[in-house]
Amino acid sequence: MSEEQLQKPIDCADVKGEAEKISTTEGGIKAAEDKEKGVVAEASGEQAEGEVNQKKVVANPLKSEGTITIGEALEAAVLTAGNKPVEWSDAAAIQAAEVRATGRTNIMPGGVAASAQSAATLNARIGSDDTKTTLADVLTGASSKLPSDKAATRKDAEGVTGAEMRNDPHLTTYPTGVAASVAAAARINQSK
């Protein structure tokens, strides 16, 4: 392959064009079939025929029907603990949840975890609870703020709970907070 071909994105028309260039050295029939990738090609002598199967791409294959996603569990925390000011333990739990939902190891600028960290930093400097940023401020619409989402599992719940506990001065979780919501979602999903 040339350097230009390596940097050029693959187009369906190019695949058929490349299939026409296939030649056989023995003059026999060669067939290449890879239905998983959507390409079927056959060559006989100097002639080649190719077919490209168009597949529909599912927007989010990890999210299945009838299960509760991590993003939805974060939104449920708004209903149970929405008036709670965001603390470091909450920010850590939200970050762990975002990492598990998206599969990324770092947090996204402007994402749910970044907002939670900013809120926790700001809240640590403010004396009055009345003016502090709450979980409702950070987590409302969380599932739409995540670039990808997946069904909550027991491993996800354990990771989020561990993050919240490690960052709490008393090594506990808030009873109706972020970790509790993800754990409840995982229990519901496991029973299905």
Curated annotation (Swiss-Prot):
Task: List where in the cell it is found.
Answer: Cytoplasm; Nucleus
**According to its record, what are the GO cellular component terms?**
cytosol; nucleus
What sequence ranges are listed for the domain SMP?
68-125, 133-190
| One Pfam match | SMP
Coordinates of motif Nuclear localization signal (NLS) in the sequence?
5-9
Note down the stretches annotated as region Disordered.
Answer: 146-174
Instruction: Identify the keywords attached in UniProt to this record, alphabetized.
Output: Cytoplasm, Nucleus, Repeat
Q: Where is the composition biased (Basic and acidic residues)?
A: 147-158
Q: Return the similarity comment.
A: Belongs to the LEA type SMP family.
Its job: LEA proteins are late embryonic proteins abundant in higher plant seed embryos. The function of those proteins is not known.
Name of protein? Late embryogenesis abundant protein 47
Gene source species: Arabidopsis thaliana (Mouse-ear cress)
Q: What is the lineage of its organism?
A: Eukaryota, Viridiplantae, Streptophyta, Embryophyta, Tracheophyta
